[in-house]
């Protein structure tokens, strides 16, 4: 077991480094110039991670979980006469649909099975038939299963038909290389406690400046007004409109520095990729099969199908927790699965220890 109480093999919150945790021992004032300067550095670093064309984009930090930032985008970006196309194959795509419905935004859905990627042919057919669609949203890595959706093709189609593109990159940004300018993404949403390896407390939106400027006065919420949040940060040197999670921001800044030290997004992707491949190979040796086809599988989290015979997930969970590991239950309805994450401060020796614990026979009868 590591210095942590448990090794979190989850898609976030995840296992953080000792140094990320240590910076949260200090208190910060939200009005302090040093703190607000740190906020500005965070915003700039996020844009530089996202694209080489930095002048075209800006970052908005938003208190709360990643879902708060997604809802801030949905509620602020789409005008009253707008219409949203959502590509969904899991819980997080469905959540965007639910947000749109709650906010009385006209919404149409392109839905595929949870283990199948977004169907580009169907998406284009919908765009051809429905001229009222103004925006298109897709989840990059759907952690319901661990599947990767074809955001390159979705965004290319979106721009081909003149739509504003929204990408939920909650569980991929910082762990998979993305150039939002090349992909023509107008709004990308992610969170502090995912591949950057910070802790929960805020999400962020990397926005195309010209599109963000169009959002002024459109928000359907005071606290989730994306434009107002950005304008305050922009004009008041990193100040948030309402109380910000100071400890979380400091931890995130430290996590960004550690990402750079590791070698950037490509190096982190390689570690996650190697973790995932090792996990699947080792689990296969003891009878566990992944749900998602290898060509659609992300390096973020892997869903495994329940093996035949006397298998109980809760027994597996309890025994692994006793050995110092925490994994995730399944989240789909048609197939019994459980999930194991590959991200965070997790390395190949951790994956080997995990599978060794499962293989001992104490969890599978």
Curated annotation (Swiss-Prot):
EC numbers for this chain: 2.6.1.37
Domain of life according to the entry: Bacteria
Catalytic activity: (2-aminoethyl)phosphonate + pyruvate = phosphonoacetaldehyde + L-alanine
Protein name per the record: 2-aminoethylphosphonate--pyruvate transaminase
Post-translational modification N6-(pyridoxal phosphate)lysine, affected residues: 194
Keyword Transmembrane helix applies: no
Enzyme class, broadest EC rank: transferase
């Amino acid at each position: 077991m590591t210095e942590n109480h448990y090794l979190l093999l989850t898609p976030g919150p995840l296992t953080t480094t000792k140094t990320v945790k240590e910076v949260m021992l200090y208190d910060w004032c939200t009005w302090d110039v040093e703190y607000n300067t740190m906020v500005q550095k965070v915003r700039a670093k996020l844009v530089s991670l996202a694209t080489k064309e930095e002048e075209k984009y800006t970052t908005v930090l938003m208190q709360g979980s990643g879902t708060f930032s997604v809802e801030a985008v949905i509620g602020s970006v789409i005008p009253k006469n707008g219409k949203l196309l959502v590509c969904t194959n899991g819980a997080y795509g469905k959540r965007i649909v639910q947000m749109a419905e709650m906010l009385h935004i006209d919404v149409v859905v392109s839905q595929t099975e949870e283990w199948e990627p977004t169907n580009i042919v169907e998406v284009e057919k919908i765009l051809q038939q429905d001229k009222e669609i103004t925006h298109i949203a897709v989840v990059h890595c759907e952690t319901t299963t661990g599947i990767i959706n074809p955001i390159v093709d979705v965004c290319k189609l979106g721009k081909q038909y003149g739509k504003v593109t929204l990408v939920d990159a909650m569980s991929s940004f910082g762990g998979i290389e993305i150039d939002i300018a090349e992909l023509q993404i107008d709004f990308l949403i992610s969170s502090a406690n995912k591949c950057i390896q910070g802790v929960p407390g805020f999400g962020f939106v990397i926005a195309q400046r010209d599109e963000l400027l169009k959002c002024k006065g459109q928000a359907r919420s005071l606290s989730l007004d994306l434009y107002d949040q950005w304008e305050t940060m922009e004009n008041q040197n990193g100040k948030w409109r309402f109380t910000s999670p100071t400890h979380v921001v400091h931890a995130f800044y430290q996590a960004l520095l550690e990402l750079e030290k590791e070698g950037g997004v490509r190096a982190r992707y390689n570690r996650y990729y190697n973790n995932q491949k090792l996990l699947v190979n080792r689990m296969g040796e003891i009878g566990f099969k992944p749900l998602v086809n290898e060509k659609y599988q992300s390096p973020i989290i892997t869903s495994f199908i329940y093996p035949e015979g006397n298998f109980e997930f809760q027994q597996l969970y309890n025994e692994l927790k006793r050995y110092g590991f925490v994994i995730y239950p399944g989240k789909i309805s048609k197939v019994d699965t459980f999930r194991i994450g590959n991200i965070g401060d997790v390395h190949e020796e951790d994956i080997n220890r995990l599978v060794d614990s499962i293989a001992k026979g104490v969890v599978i009868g």
